[in-house]
């Protein structure tokens, strides 16, 4: 591999003001350091760095259905029919995707068909 002579290296170092050959592998200053400081996490379910099991730091376990604070509709008590409804409860038939199939009638003039 070609390199400059010692005289040329010293001349370059003197002109630049620092040693250009000292750390060639770390020539970029924006590279992150190998030892990182510990993270500064906000206080929450995962603020502990150790003894923090996945099931306790999973945010989905903390979610609950919304609580109804106020409603304009009156809720029915389970097991009791509504007192104000005058219409008797009728059972609803199952919904079919098409009109009911008509039953075919056999012709009376040709009984073998």
Swiss-Prot record:
Q: How does it sit in the membrane?
A: Peripheral membrane protein
UniProt keyword annotations, A-Z: Acetylation, Electron transport, Membrane, Mitochondrion, Mitochondrion inner membrane, Phosphoprotein, Respiratory chain, Transport
Q: Is Mitochondrion included in the keywords of this UniProt record? A: yes
Keyword check for Phosphoprotein: yes
Q: Which GO terms describe its cellular component?
A: mitochondrial inner membrane; mitochondrion; respiratory chain complex I
Q: Which residues carry this modification: N6-acetyllysine?
A: 40
Positions carrying N-acetylalanine: 2
- One example of a Gene Ontology biological process annotation: proton motive force-driven mitochondrial ATP synthesis
Q: Where is this region: Disordered?
A: 32-51
* UniProt cross-references to Pfam families, sorted A to Z: CI-B14_5a
Report the GO molecular function annotations.
NADH dehydrogenase (ubiquinone) activity
Chain positions with Phosphothreonine modification: 96
Q: Where in the cell is it found?
A: Mitochondrion inner membrane
* Subunit structure comment from the entry: Complex I is composed of 45 different subunits.
Q: What does this protein do?
A: Accessory subunit of the mitochondrial membrane respiratory chain NADH dehydrogenase (Complex I), that is believed not to be involved in catalysis. Complex I functions in the transfer of electrons from NADH to the respiratory chain. The immediate electron acceptor for the enzyme is believed to be ubiquinone.
Q: Which PANTHER family match?
A: NADH DEHYDROGENASE [UBIQUINONE] 1 ALPHA SUBCOMPLEX SUBUNIT 7, NADH-UBIQUINONE OXIDOREDUCTASE SUBUNIT B
Family to which this protein belongs: Belongs to the complex I NDUFA7 subunit family.
| The protein's name in its UniProt record | NADH dehydrogenase [ubiquinone] 1 alpha subcomplex subunit 7
Q: Which organism is it from?
A: Homo sapiens
